[in-house]
Amino acid sequence: MIKVVFFGTSTLSKCCLEAIFQDPEFVVCGVVTQPDKVNERNNKINFSAVKQFCIENNIPCFQPEKNIQIKTELAQLQADIGVCVAFGQYIHNDIINLFPYKIANLHPSKLPLLRGGAPLHWTIINGFTTSSLSVIELVQKMDAGPIWKQKDFKVNPNWNTGDLFEYVQTHAPQFLIQCLKEIVSGKSQWKEQINPPTFGLNIKKEQERLDLNLEPKAFINWVKGLAPKPGGWLEFEGQNIKILQATYLGKMTSTTAVGQITKISKQGIEIALANDEIVLLQIIQIPGKRAMGVSEIINGKHPFAEGKFFH
């Protein structure tokens, strides 16, 4: 039996934890996840998906502000290996060294490309046609450890970040389990990351505003890359309208001002980018309302009209 301590917080983390927990070759002897967060709207405490799974399956769960605070407790578990999936917290070197096989980290990009906390968003924003699942040894430098194995896959050109996440969530758990078994079996295949890295850091608030001066392909990639969350937006009459799906239509034959609505139909809202390029906004979200197709919005009262502007 392989004794594991799991570090993770997100929905992807929970999927990987569940797969490890259900595999008869593993024993999950402890889980470390982020401290609970308080919902500012209703003041209720929100558990991470990982903590909820631990409660349901009676797995010891630790939630330190800093993981070095539980070094003694983790040492007492005498685990063989640590596993990290989207933990969201720096792991101290003293914690890494508790485990004979160190800590294996799953990262959903073709490392050394897109080190950081938002590789899925940046895969779509950058228009990548391929990506990878990477299992690396966790080291102090962010996502810089030697690579155990990578599993390449094609990125569907129609995917947004949500679609890519669903793919990763479906395929990552079993790939991770395969790698863990190989690591503990003593096979020695670690390879250092040699090529220069790029970074896929967390999306900043100011990056959520879409740029109408981009080339059409880049604009569409930003729409897809920010969808469904956090959602890229454009300003319209004082409101931030999220643009969750858009398509490039082509170039206007006449000169059109950037951001101007040129046509509204059941297919969507046509607006101009720079150089008279036209994109079709198909799914949008008005503040306080759910995301809707434009075909549904125009059936009711709405503020949009030809000649008005997005900014």
From Swiss-Prot:
The entry's (6S)-5,6,7,8-tetrahydrofolate-binding residues are 109-112
Which GO molecular function annotations are given, in alphabetical order? methionyl-tRNA formyltransferase activity
What's the superkingdom here? Bacteria
CDD domains from the xrefs? FMT_core_Met-tRNA-FMT_N
State the GO CC annotations: cytosol
A Pfam family the protein falls into: Formyl_trans_N
Task: List the catalytic activities from the record.
Answer: L-methionyl-tRNA(fMet) + (6R)-10-formyltetrahydrofolate = N-formyl-L-methionyl-tRNA(fMet) + (6S)-5,6,7,8-tetrahydrofolate + H(+)
| UniProt-listed Enzyme Commission number(s) | 2.1.2.9
Which keywords annotate this record? Protein biosynthesis, Transferase
Entry similarity comment:
Belongs to the Fmt family.
What this chain does, per the entry, is described as: Attaches a formyl group to the free amino group of methionyl-tRNA(fMet). The formyl group appears to play a dual role in the initiator identity of N-formylmethionyl-tRNA by promoting its recognition by IF2 and preventing the misappropriation of this tRNA by the elongation apparatus.
Q: How is this protein named in the record?
A: Methionyl-tRNA formyltransferase
**Organism of this sequence:** Mycoplasma pneumoniae (strain ATCC 29342 / M129 / Subtype 1)
Q: Which gene encodes it?
A: fmt
